[in-house]
């Protein structure tokens, strides 16, 4: 299950959460190394954009709680499809629908 997650950190000053933010990157690197995250990009200013590839909603929920524990944030979550999935869907016989 693919999800695009965009974080918007809580309002404290960046200097107040600097150490927590430093801890985020090793945590995220572990997710990249294990294939749980496919990509991560820091947003200009603060926040990050991550593509997670997880086996369940519960796994995503657990990851977001760990993330928010390290860097308190709000998350926008967008479910995604693999490109080949949408191509297969579009090529299905429309009469079958």
Question: For each predicted feature, which ranges?
Answer:
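Conserved, structured core segments of small domains
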Residues: 1-97
């Amino acid at each position: 299950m693919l999800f695009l997650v965009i974080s918007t950190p809580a309002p404290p000053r960046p200097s107040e959460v600097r150490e927590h933010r430093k801890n985020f990157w090793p945590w995220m690197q572990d997710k990249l190394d294990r294939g749980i995250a496919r990509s991560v990009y820091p947003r200009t200013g603060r926040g990050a954009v991550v593509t997670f590839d997880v086996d369940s909603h519960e796994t995503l929920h657990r990851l977001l709680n760990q993330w928010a524990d390290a860097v308190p944030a709000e998350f926008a979550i967008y479910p995604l499809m693999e490109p080949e999935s949408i191509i297969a869907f579009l090529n299905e016989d429309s009469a079958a629908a």
